[in-house]
Amino acid sequence: MTEWRFIASRLDGTGGEDFIDFDLPLDEPEVHQVLNGPGGLTASIPHEHAHLRVDGAPVFVPWSTAIYAEASGVIRGGGILTDPVEEGPKLSLDCVGFPGYLGGTRYTGIRSIERGDPLKVSRHLWEHTQARKSFDLGVEFVGASSSREMFIGDDDVPPSATPQKVDPYELNYWSTHDLAKEFDHLAELAPFEYRMEHAWDGDRIRHRLRYGYPTLGARRTDLRFVVGENVLEIPKIEMPGEEYASHVIVLGAGEGRSMTRDEQSVTTGRLGRDVVVSDKTITTPAQAKARAQAELKARTGTPDVTDLQVIQHPNAVLGSYQVGDEIALTTAGGWTDERDLWVKILGIQITPGTDVTTLQVRRAEKVN
């Protein structure tokens, strides 16, 4: 059985942290690793330990305490404590992964970008944030360092064009108040993928935001998921007709003919089916186009699987795969007669103290 421990530190806002407890007595811990999302950690602690103090100060302080889950010396995940809640005899702890720190964080300057690289601009959001006093988490960047040059505010303009006028991408203190939203918008535009990684480096933990362009992870021919070997139950393979569409229209901000919009379609060999996506947060043609393309790809109508429960097994030991990886799944054929398909790991939910890990997956060709 893997040996787990839970470590608490105090983030100092200058890129460092002070460790305050190396063996928190947590109950019901769950570690969440996510592709293109914050991830994090949830747990509870018995009431008799909920008021732990170090040097007279409480251990559990929102937006100050970080908690990490370590398995046999390897950090499997962690996050920043945001919302401790007393629930009867226990204190519930909710820790958001480091990418979630940008949520609700504002841009304090003024910047207008006509042509640029979305990945580089996303890094600028972190650099801008961490340059502020008390906002530095010590996040570093690894992996891809660039994506593609484009007119970020108007992706309908070809990158090779020299337009007379183009709508710029704006960052400013009066309207840019959620940098996590901006970061994810840039990830969708490029597109790029990312995940957060924590690892020991001597006596400190380094925090690395890993980028992949256009994707992160690899097709792992050395690993496999097989029902009856390391997959506990036959996964539910669905072919939902209500999600199928051959024509997608996205309607964003505005009214009537002035609405931001984009249409995408594909010939499928089946009857044509429409889907209308309304989202008033979409304000540019580039956003509408990216959303329509993503919706169309996800609505091909081919059989899909979304969840797997896997156990520790030589075929795929915990830690041998990461979010973003693609792994072959072999299952028993159901009414769809799907037995072998490649799935991409979008999320890993680890329950320390058990040998069972829950994976959020999608059919690889639907998300790449």
Indicate where each model-derived feature is located:
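Beta-strand-rich assembly/attachment modules of structural machines
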Residues: 1-123, 127
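Acidic, small/polar-enriched beta strand-loop surface segments
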Residues: 2-7, 211-351, 368
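Short beta-strand and beta-hairpin "edge-sheet" elements
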Residues: 24, 66-96, 195, 329-361
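A mature extracytoplasmic/lumenal domain signature
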Residues: 47, 97-99, 198, 254, ...
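Short intrinsically disordered coil segments
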Residues: 57-62, 109-114, 225-231, 265-267, ...
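Solvent-exposed, acidic/flexible segments
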Residues: 74, 114-119, 172-180, 240-243, ...
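Charged- and aromatic-enriched interaction segments used to assemble
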Residues: 90, 96-239
